[in-house]
Every structure is written in C-alpha cells, then in structure tokens.
C-alpha cells in the first residue's frame, strides 16, 4: 500500500446528507455514480508501464531531493451559481524547489506550447536563468490573490525584500476551473497560500481532485493534479527527474493511455462490474462546448531534476514535456494554455555572490538524452495519474464531471489489447 500523502490541507463543507461523499482529496456531491467512486489507483496499478525507465521510490516530483509540495483544497456549497459566493470547487498547489531558495537559487527554464493562459514571472526567469521562490498553481481569476500569498510568505521569511533586498515577481500558473467553481469569487485567499507553503512536504503527493486541481476537467473526465518521476541508471548519472501537472485539457475522443485509444473506446468498454456502457458519451462535450471560456482547457507542467542543467538545457526539457503531453492524445488546441517550467537543484546560484565569479557543475549536452527521455515518460505518466486519481465532482449549477472508471480502464488496458512501448 502506498504511503499516505502529506502536505495537503482540505477545507470542505457539506450538508449532513452528503457527508459520505466528502473526502480529503475531493467531493462527488452524489454517491450514486455506479462504480466511478471506487478506490482510485495510479496508472501503474492498471498494468501500464510507460517507457523504459524506472520511477523513483514515490513516483512523484518529490523524489527529487529537497522538492516539497503543498495543497489547500476548497470545497463549499452546492446548487445554483451565486457569483462571488459559491459553490466553491477550487484550491492552490505549491511547489517549493528547495529550502532557502531565495538565497540558493535554482537554474530554471520555461516553454510555452500554446499561450492561451498565464504563468507569471516567466520574463525574469528568461532574463536571469534562475528561479528564486516557490511556484504556485491556482485558477485563472485567483492569480493576483495567490501572488499576494506567495509575497506575504516570502516577506515573512525574508523581511528585507523591497527594503534592503531585491523585490520579487512570483511564479503563479493558472487553469480555468469556472465550469465547476464560482471562479468570480476568487475564493483562494492569501492565508490559504501561506498554509499551503507552510504545510508543503517532501513526502507522497496527493493527486486528482486536490489543491489547484479541485475544479479541473481533462479529456472529458475529472482531471487535476498528477505526478510521476524517473530515476536514471548509474551509467547515465543516476539523476532523478520528477514532474507535476495540473491537467485541465483535452477532449474525450483524444485520450490515449499506454497507446490504447481509451477515449474512443471508453463508452462501449466491456467490464466485469456493474458499470453499464455510457448511453450518451457526447453529453459532456455538448455542455462544455456550450460554456464560455472553458471549451479547450489548459495544462501546467512543472519539471524538477537534480541533474546539473543550465537554463538553456532546462528550456529544452520544457519543450520535451510537450511530447509526453502528446502521448496522451493532446494536440495543444487553439484555446489551450500549455505552460512548462523546469528547474534543477543540481547547482546553487548564490543570491549576492561575494566574488565576481563562481563555479557550477554542468551536464554535457551529449549526455542529455536520458534526461530528455525521462522527462517525456514522467510527463505522460503524471497526466494519467491525474485522471486515475481524481474523484467525481458535482459543482456549480449541478454540473457533474465523472471520474474515469477504473473497471472500464482495466478492461481496455488488459494484456490482450494493451500496446506496450
């Protein structure tokens, strides 16, 4: 049995009649959805072995030494949308690259596959080549408040910022959760961000309907947070590459898992359970396409590694993460915001160097291929873990997004049909 994820705080309010539908990782709002609320699993538990490299012990971004993840999940209210009040299905997820990252900066690089969205702070990363504060993920309209939370947390730890020290431009990445959440309410508070950062840990990472992923939809199913990692053989340096995603992208017919066209076959998948074929597999697409601003979705990909890479190489890793995204079926549609940010803990960039020069270890480009492969594999698996870890959610106006059915997946991914890479 996997270790219990830590670094996650949930704020969930439910009526007594619906209390059984509440869970720390999400809330269905309804307990009658056949078998979709059975115990959630990770992709590997379904027999998927994505690529050739082995995962780290946690198969998570926190396998990279020093990296921490924290969540705050907000689930309150039900029924019709009351703008500014609820229902609330949202949250914040933070990634802390290392302790004292302000003084021990990490090399970083970013890539924007399609720019219908926002990740703040990228101009300074491109200019400086490093990252010097935590990364936060949230919903689109909550970006300014979440940035305030990151700033407040940093000011508490480094009171000289803006007085005797430099200022900062936080990195906050967004996806639109407005189909399930009262996004106008901007319910993630400054205090929520501080809690997420204070509670961030290096242990197992909660996935699916948690933190920034609480209101996300991916490939026509409940999406959200997913993570995975790869550890290179000693001959390739023994480095670890970890990925965390917030998956809010894709259309159901596009979904591919382990080479199997799951999205196309899902509605008629045979199972040995009580799950009946979906009588109207297009109902989700019709309702989503008819809603404003949320027809094509987005994905945020955070890549961490202890390989000693510079900003240019990390930007290259961000580009390769797009290949892992494509393996799951995504085509980076016109209205999708697909942002990749990579950082390395393999070097320390000092805050104010006392000498005019300092030394960094650098992995030769000719030895980069294994790291590239690991990034592609971990990105693909992190997306699938987001899907298999998510739980069904009923949000504003009674809109319901089903979690992908584990029994149907087992049938589709059985040994006689699964395509192995």
Q: Across the structure, where does each feature detected by a protein language model lie?
A:
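Short intrinsically disordered, low-complexity coil segments enriched in acidic
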Residues: 1-3, 23-24
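Residue-identity detector for glycine
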Residues: 7, 26-29
């Amino acid at each position: 049995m996997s270790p219990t994820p830590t670094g996650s705080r949930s704020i969930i309010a439910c009526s007594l009649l619906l209390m059984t539908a509440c869970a720390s990782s999400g809330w269905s709002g309804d307990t009658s959805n056949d078998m979709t609320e059975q115990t959630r699993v990770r992709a590997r538990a379904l027999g998927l072995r994505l690529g050739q490299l082995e995962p780290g012990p946690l198969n998570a971004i926190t396998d990279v030494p020093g990296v921490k993840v924290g969540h705050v999940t907000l689930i309150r209210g039900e029924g019709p949308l009351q703008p500014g009040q609820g229902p609330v299905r949202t949250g914040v997820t933070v990634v802390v690259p290392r302790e004292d990252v302000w003084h021990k900066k990490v090399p970083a690089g970013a890539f924007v596959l399609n720019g219908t969205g926002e990740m703040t702070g990228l101009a300074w990363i491109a200019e400086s080549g490093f990252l010097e504060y935590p990364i936060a993920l949230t919903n689109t309209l909550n970006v300014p408040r979440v940035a305030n939370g990151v700033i407040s947390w940093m000011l508490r730890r480094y009171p000289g910022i803006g007085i005797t020290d430099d200022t900062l431009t936080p990195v906050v990445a967004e996806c639109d959760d407005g189909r399930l959440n009262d996004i106008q309410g901007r319910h993630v508070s400054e205090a929520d961000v501080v809690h997420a950062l204070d509670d961030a840990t290096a242990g197992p990472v909660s996935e699916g309907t948690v933190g920034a992923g609480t209101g996300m939809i991916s490939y026509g199913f409940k999406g959200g947070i997913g993570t995975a990692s790869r550890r290179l053989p000693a001959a390739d340096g023994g480095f670890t590459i970890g990925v965390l995603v917030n998956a809010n992208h894709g259309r159901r017919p596009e979904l591919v898992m382990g080479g199997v066209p799951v999205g196309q076959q899902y509605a008629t998948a045979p199972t040995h359970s009580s799950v009946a074929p979906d009588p109207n597999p297009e109902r989700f697409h019709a309702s989503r396409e008819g809603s404003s601003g949320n027809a094509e979705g987005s994905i945020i990909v955070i890549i961490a590694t202890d390989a000693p890479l510079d900003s240019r190489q990390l930007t290259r890793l961000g580009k390769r993460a797009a290949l892992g995204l494509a393996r799951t079926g995504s085509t980076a549609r016109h209205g999708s915001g697909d942002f990749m940010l990579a950082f390395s803990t393999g070097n320390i960039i000092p805050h104010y160097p006392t000498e005019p020069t300092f030394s960094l270890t650098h992995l030769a480009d000719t030895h980069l291929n294994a790291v590239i492969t690991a990034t592609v594999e971990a990105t693909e698996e992190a997306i699938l873990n987001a899907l298999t870890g998510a739980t069904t959610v009923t949000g504003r106006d009674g809109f319901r997004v089903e979690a992908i059915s584990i029994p149907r997946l087992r049938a589709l991914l059985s040994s006689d049909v699964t395509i192995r890479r």
